[in-house]
Every structure is written in C-alpha cells, then in structure tokens.
Swiss-Prot record:
The keyword Aminoacyl-tRNA synthetase does not apply. It comes from the Archaea. Its EC number is 2.1.1.-. It is an enzyme of class 2 (transferase). This is Probable ribosomal RNA small subunit methyltransferase A. Specifically dimethylates two adjacent adenosines in the loop of a conserved hairpin near the 3'-end of 16S rRNA in the 30S particle. May play a critical role in biogenesis of 30S subunits. Signal peptide: none annotated. It comes from Methanopyrus kandleri (strain AV19 / DSM 6324 / JCM 9639 / NBRC 100938). PROSITE patterns: RRNA_A_DIMETH, SAM_RNA_A_N6_MT. GO terms for molecular function: RNA binding; rRNA (adenine-N6,N6-)-dimethyltransferase activity. CDD domains: AdoMet_MTases (cd02440).
Amino acid sequence: MRSVEYLAYLRSKYGIRPRRRLGQHFMVDDNILEFMVEAAEVREDDIVLEIGPGPGLLTRYLMTRAGQVIAVELDGRMVEILKRELGEAPNLEIVRADFLEYDVPDDVNKVVANIPYNISSPITFKLLELDIDVAVLTYQREFAERMVAEPGSKKYSRLTVMVNLLADVELLRGVPRRAFIPPPRVGSSVVRLTPKSEEERPDVDPDTLESVCRALFQHKNKTVRNALLLSAHEWATDREQAREVLEELPEDLLSERPLHLPPERVAELAAAIESALG
C-alpha cells in the first residue's frame, strides 16, 4: 500500500489530524522515503533510530531493511496507532518520549528521520554527540542551506561552523512541499550527516568553541577583534580580560571578519583563546 493510501486509511480509521504545534507534517512521497533509507545504507545488522515517526510512514520502510528500529514519538495518539498497526513487528521498538530528553541506547548506529523543524538545531547537536555512523534527516530548506553554506556567503553562520566541525555534511536533494500532508509553508531538503571521529574534531573544549562562535557571529561583518570585544560577555569575565587575551592572538586572525573564517580557523581561534584564558 502506498504511503498516501496508508495515511488515508489511518485517518479514516482513527480520525487523526497532524498537530502543527508538534511540527507534524507527514511525508507521503514513497520515492523520497525510499531514498532516505537508501542514503543511510540501512542493512539488517543496523539498529536505526527514528525521531518523530508519527503514523509510521517512514517506519514501514525502515522495518523492511533494519535489524531493529527504535521509533521515539512524543504524541501519545501516534504511539497508540503505531502499536496497533505495527507493534507486532519483532524488529520494532516504540518509545513514547521527548527525544531531547531521551537516553539513546549505545548500540544505535544510524538515524533516519523526518524531524520537527521547530527543534532542528537541538536535535542535530544531540545527534552529533552520539557514537553513530550516519544520520539522514529532512530539514527545512533554509536551515539545510545554512548547514552547507560557504564562508563569505549570506547564509554562512554559527550553525554552519559548529555542524561542519563535528560532521561531514551533504545536502542530498530537495523535497517539494507536496511531498507532505499537510504541506509545510516552505520547501525541505534531505541532508546526510557523517559524524567526524574524535581525532578529526577540534581539540578545544566544546563550551569554549560554542561561546566563541556565538560571540563572532553576533557581529559577523565586523573584524574578529571587534566582534570578540563587543560580545566579550559570551567568552570572557569582562572586557578587560577580553583585551588581555586579544593581545596574545595573531593580528592576521584578529583582522579577519567572522563571515569569511572557515570552520577550521574558528576552531583555531577558539583553541588560542582557551589557551590564553588558561
């Protein structure tokens, strides 16, 4: 049964309606659902996490390929439908939980999901803390484009830097609004995240990196020196300490503009600041 027909069957049987406050838009395009599973190279020895499965449209595809699927859903109505319709499958575990508070099992090695767009950022960074092989996710198109933006471009941002320091990011394809019921207000994109190993990640405290990055991109068109001074509260005790630290940093780095700094240079700057702060 095609996904659009399966959803119609569920709506007729259970009277379900998507809840916009939970960011529910159900993908019914079977070509894209299959594409996502293929992009993650889901195999029978994989344990796959799905975030926000809703009525189980993507879940059905994952179940045919994965050794185990763990579907984490916040909406109690959807959990009951999943249990009634798919719950007897031996390789499906249905969990009612807020993913942001959920303790992901250590043996999960892949994530495939159409995530709620209103919490895309916290979901992404939680996933990048996990020891997984790959995540294939659907994002709002504008968010996805920021993730892969080039230094100097209008969409280059703190998000770009932080994500690219932690993972290899690939924008795989666009998704039209009509692929969902109800259609979201904007287009979407499928993105593949391949987390970097510990050796590939920057050798700097994550909190320092985040605070420096936040300071830089609050004033991304100013020089690095001015951006760090204007947002000294983000990374230093006060402006006096900030000035002392800046005296120890390379002038060529301070005269750059955050908008043009590649992620690796931002990490280099954060490491230098961390060292100067002691």
